[in-house]
From Swiss-Prot:
InterPro entries: Chromosome_partition/occlusion, ParB/RepB/Spo0J, ParB/Sulfiredoxin_dom, ParB/Sulfiredoxin_sf. SUPFAM superfamilies: KorB DNA-binding domain-like (SSF109709), ParB/Sulfiredoxin (SSF110849). GO terms for cellular component: chromosome. Signal peptide: none annotated. This is Probable plasmid-partitioning protein ParB. GO terms for molecular function: DNA binding. GO terms for biological process: chromosome segregation.
Length: 291
């Protein structure tokens, strides 16, 4: 079996486990015997959503067991961390679980697919989770995943390309190439913008704000959080990006139109000015020539 075939089989089985319900022997574990999964892509759990889930658990119990794996003398949650957290809010001391023997790679695939299919991840958690999956699939350190994707875009290695295609197949319509080109770069955004994306800001809005001067981005983020629409943000970004250029053009025009200033130039500066004017853009030459 090739690496691609083996990975495809793993992804298919992991997708079944993630989509649930999980089939297997159900047992019960104390909540303090469990710990959050190391392969969990979700960094934040909304307080309001957890409170609602806790209320549901209080009235109906936990309808689907958590999927866990043994790690030393504890159990790591692979799928169901929200249920575990909500169960503690609800005052439960035990939760139903199904224990599976899973590798790090299997656990990462299951955790990511479960989160992508059950409840939308914020964009930063999605990107970081997929990078973790890429690292596991290619057998590299997680911090190398971004640079490796960029390398493969420039110089594709057939086996790695096949592996990545198999990785992204069960995750939706997005290809690994699209992910590498369009989403990975957001991790390089300034920290306030990354945090805004983590809090749920749309990528289209964040991409707009990223075009603005960095010292103005916090104000734009605040405007979006206060309800500003795309049209308003586009106009504000355009104003911030083009205002300095317009001001410079006006100042240049004013200086060139100031005959007294031109007359005060010494011969060396006057010669430099003539040289600079001889290299003016063609559009400006045509405008001057027409007048």
């Amino acid at each position: 079996m090739t690496r691609r075939e083996g990975l495809a089989a793993l992804l298919g089985e992991s997708a079944k486990l993630a989509q649930g319900p999980v089939v297997g022997h159900t047992s019960t574990l104390r909540v303090d015997q469990l710990r959050a999964g190391s392969q969990q892509p979700r960094r934040q759990f909304g307080t309001e959503g957890l409170t609602e889930l806790a209320a549901s658990i209080q009235s109906q119990g936990i309808l689907q067991p958590l999927l866990v794996r043994a790690v030393g003398d504890t159990y790591e949650i692979v799928a169901g961390e929200r249920r575990w957290r909500a169960a503690q809010l609800a005052g439960l001391t035990e939760v139903p679980v199904i224990v599976k023997s899973l590798t790090d790679q299997e656990a990462a695939v299951i955790a990511l697919i479960e989160n992508l299919q059950r409840e939308n991840l914020n964009l930063i958690d999605e990107v970081e989770g997929k990078l973790l999956l890429v690292a596991n699939a290619l057998g590299i350190a997680s911090e190398q995943a971004r640079s490796r994707l960029n390398e493969l875009l420039r110089n594709p290695v057939p086996e790695d390309v096949e592996t990545l295609s198999a990785v992204f197949l069960p995750l939706g319509r997005e290809s690994w190439q699209s992910f590498a080109k369009n989403k990975v770069r957001i991790l390089n955004y300034p920290p306030p913008l990354v945090e805004a994306l983590r809090q749920g800001m749309a990528l289209t809005m964040a991409t707009l704000i990223a075009r603005a001067p960095e010292n103005k981005q916090a104000d734009l983020i605040a405007k979006v959080q206060q309800g500003a629409g795309r049209k308003e943000i586009v106009a504000e970004v355009e104003r911030l990006c083009h205002r300095p250029t317009v001001r410079l053009e006006k100042r240049v025009a004013q200086a060139l139109g100031n005959q007294k200033w031109l007359d005060r130039l010494d011969p060396q500066d006057a010669e430099a000015m003539q040289h600079w004017l001889s290299q003016m853009p063609r559009a400006l030459q045509q405008e001057i020539g027409d007048n």
